[in-house]
Design a protein with these regions (language model features):
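Tight coil/turn sites that cap or link beta-strands
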Residues: 38-45, 91-94, 98-100
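Low-complexity intrinsically disordered segments
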Residues: 134-138
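Short, conserved beta-strand element in jelly-roll/cupin
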Residues: 56-76
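Short acidic-glycine-tyrosine-enriched beta hairpin
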Residues: 78-97
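A short hydrophobic beta-strand segment most commonly corresponding to one strand
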Residues: 109-129
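Conserved small/polar residues in nucleotide/adenosyl-binding loops
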Residues: 143-145
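A short, N-terminal "cap"/entry segment at the start of jelly-roll beta-barrel domains
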Residues: 1-46, 50-53
Length: 145
């Protein structure tokens, strides 16, 4: 089984020029809408140009592209293959990013919109969970990016 997992959507109705999707994530207890209005990187590189990542201690992400294209860079040293690049579009389903996975994303030139149907655990604190971590100041232990 791959370390990279998706929560697929279900098409439950189609009419001319309209598709109805069930995008339910049973595990979700929070939803975030993340809009990149152009070719954005989140989190952006730091002041010296080093990559930065988010690493949530108390949240699993279920990131689903609803418009555009977004590419995720993932590092998780507990996986058999700790480094992955995953390109998402509206057909991909929700990319599951487990807690403690280093991650960042890059949008295509036209930007992108992602809904994150997250699962937040006891101890979640938004002011702590969304602080970028710089590779210049923090080692990823196994690999250098």
């Amino acid at each position: 089984m791959s370390d990279i997992q998706f929560k697929k959507h279900r098409v439950f109705r189609e009419t001319e020029d309209v598709i109805f999707y069930d995008i339910s994530v049973d595990e979700s207890n929070a939803s975030d809408l993340v809009v990149h209005t152009g070719a954005a990187i989140s989190p952006p590189d730091d002041a010296v140009g080093a990559k930065q990542f988010y690493i949530h201690e108390y949240q699993d992400d279920y990131n689903r592209v609803v418009s555009g294209v977004r590419t995720f860079e993932l590092v998780n040293n507990t996986w058999k293959y700790p480094y992955h690049i995953v390109k998402l579009d509206v057909h991909s389903g929700a990319l599951i990013i487990p807690a403690k996975t280093w991650h960042r994303s890059v949008s295509g030139a036209e930007g992108s919109i992602v809904i994150n149907q997250a699962k937040r655990y006891k101890g979640f604190n938004a002011s702590e969970e969304f602080k970028p971590v710089s590779c210049a100041e923090n080692s990823l232990s196994l690999i250098h990016i």
